[in-house]
């Protein structure tokens, strides 16, 4: 019902979900909805049920084409929000399960995690600490996925980042610095290809920076 009227596999449709602990369940529901949409489309166009082979091909096509992002960053849940549902170890395992499913089903256009510094900054971190914690979390996911036997170039393009931007001067370069550190580490430490070296991020204004009065900027 929620996505009625939306073609979830259209090239111009991308769904971003800010969900973390329940991410595996919500993501599974979303993927099944996208698959069901296309199965229903087949039935409407062909006036019959698809065969098992046709249904399998439809599912594979959907997973290869669906676009979006699921936040699913359990590490910042612990560091910045204190809203952990499961232990860190179990959560990393489940996140690894998601990424392994993406690899096995060629899910290339969906970000399996949005590694989030925003919430860490809102909890009190300055720009430098935000960047340090966020990249550290990113490398933690990389090491966890590599330990499960996944190849760096099979999963690194599915990783995205989320940074806070405020009034501190360091925010003017946080994106460039993050991209530089990530690219160098991906290339030199992990032997990743050019696509995997690209750090893709979203940013938005820091909520805690929006003060009605701030002496540092209003004393002139």
Regions flagged by a language model, labelled:
Residues 1-174, 189, 196-204:
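Catalytic alpha/beta active-site cores
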Residues 185:
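Catalytic core of soluble alpha/beta enzymes
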Residues 213-214:
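Extended amphipathic alpha-helical segments with heptad-repeat/coiled-coil character used for oligomerization
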